[in-house]
């Protein structure tokens, strides 16, 4: 995850360089339930509006939470499917808050409504992310349900009315890139706190729809626009949070943008980006699915590391006998091709390994989703 707005602030208000701090434990994205009221084209969990057998019970979830707390996991992102369909979502969320976790909810927003907004507000989630993949019909087509855009937007508005930090998550593909500028305008019109741009990753239905992955020139155009919008928001003092995910080449592309626009700040930004270190799958980001299987991140559902019913998460996470985990935790990673030769490995860290694995069968092959030109990779 590349926190673009953080580095925009560094451009305008540089802070002293400090020693990098290693997070105590990984951020855990937890798919509590696979059931969902939508069937989105790019869903990595391939969810549907049916019950999936074998999911962790609430007592099992609590036991895992105890282990995560002892392992110093700082953040729980509760996801699905649609997490609001879990019968005990509020009890689980409240327990997580009481234990001191930073707790976020990853929702499609359609089930946030007047009947439950007070319960949601009472939990005091630190953040609620709502997926919007375009304006109006574009979103409805991606979500495969008419009216879902208006329902999701209504959920965001309810969150804003109840002082809950809410944000938009947008997955970029060729089929919805035309609505990107409209979503940025929506951020202004609705005074939304956060914008998260997710590049299409090759997992679940996203793997089946990778032919819709935005072409590289389109991706570059979108990123250029996002850089300028984020800069404008910072210059206006709006301080909206802007984050991108699933393509750590964004950080390198941003550095080249800084070299052109703010050359006097380029070395400072480069050092800050190196301290961040790029892709954190298997290191500072983890996933637990609805069945209790542990994965390096949410797009590795086809590759399990172990199950929390059989071994504690803390034990699974530190086991480097698994070849994928050994490589993800290695520094540098055993990258090949362009990624192995890239001048900016210490910023990107090999980008998203699941795309390489899905396309070539090799964990460590070059990432086919890297949109950088050769002259941007090797200089």
Residue ranges of predicted features:
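Cysteine-cluster motifs in flexible loop/terminal segments that predominantly coordinate metals
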Residues: 333-377
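Short, basic/aromatic recognition patches
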Residues: 268-277
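Short, acidic, Ser/Thr-enriched surface-loop or helix-capping motifs
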Residues: 288-289
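Short Fe-S-cluster ligation motifs
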Residues: 67-80, 365-379
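C-terminal accessory region of radical SAM enzymes
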Residues: 217-268, 293-343, 348-349
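Radical SAM/AdoMet-radical enzyme domain recognition
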Residues: 58-215
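N-terminal pre-core extensions flanking Radical SAM catalytic domains
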Residues: 1-51, 66-69, 313
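Short, small/polar residue-rich loop motifs at catalytic or cofactor-binding pockets
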Residues: 279-282
């Amino acid at each position: 995850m590349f926190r673009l707005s953080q580095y925009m602030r560094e451009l305008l208000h540089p802070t002293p360089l400090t020693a990098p701090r290693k997070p105590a434990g990984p951020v855990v994205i937890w798919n509590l339930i696979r059931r969902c009221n939508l069937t989105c084209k790019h869903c990595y969990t391939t969810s549907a509006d049916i019950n999936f057998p074998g999911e962790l019970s609430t007592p099992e979830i609590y036991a895992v939470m105890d282990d995560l707390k002892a392992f110093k996991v700082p953040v729980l992102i509760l996801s699905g499917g649609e997490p609001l369909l879990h019968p005990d979502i509020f009890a689980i969320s409240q327990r997580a808050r009481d234990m001191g976790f930073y707790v976020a909810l990853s929702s499609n927003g359609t089930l946030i409504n007047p009947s439950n907004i007070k319960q949601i507000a009472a939990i005091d989630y630190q953040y609620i992310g709502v997926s919007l993949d375009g304006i109006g019909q574009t979103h409805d087509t991606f979500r495969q349900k008419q009216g879902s855009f208006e329902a999701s937007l209504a959920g965001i508005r309810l969150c804003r009315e109840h002082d809950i930090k809410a944000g938009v998550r947008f997955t970029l593909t060729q089929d919805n890139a035309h609505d990107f500028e409209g979503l940025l305008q929506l951020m202004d019109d609705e005074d939304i706190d956060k914008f998260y741009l997710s590049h299409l990753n090759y997992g679940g239905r996203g793997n089946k729809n990778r032919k819709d992955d935005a072409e590289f020139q389109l991706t570059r155009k979108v990123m250029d626009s996002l850089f300028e919008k984020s800069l404008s928001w910072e210059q206006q003092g709006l301080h909206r949070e802007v984050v991108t995910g699933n393509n750590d080449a964004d950080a390198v592309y941003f550095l080249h943008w800084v070299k052109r626009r703010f050359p006097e700040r380029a070395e400072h930004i480069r050092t800050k980006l190196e301290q961040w270190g790029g892709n954190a799958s298997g290191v500072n980001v983890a996933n637990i699915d609805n069945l209790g299987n542990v994965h390096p991140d949410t797009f590795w559902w086809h590759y399990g590391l172990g199950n929390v019913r059989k071994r504690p998460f803390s034990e699974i996470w530190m086991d480097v006998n698994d070849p994928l985990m050994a490589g993800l935790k290695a520094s540098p990673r055993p990258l090949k091709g362009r990624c192995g030769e890239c001048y900016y490995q210490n910023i990107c860290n090999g980008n998203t390994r699941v795309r390489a694995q899905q396309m070539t069968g090799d964990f460590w092959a070059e990432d086919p989703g890297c949109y950088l030109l050769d002259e941007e990779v090797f200089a």
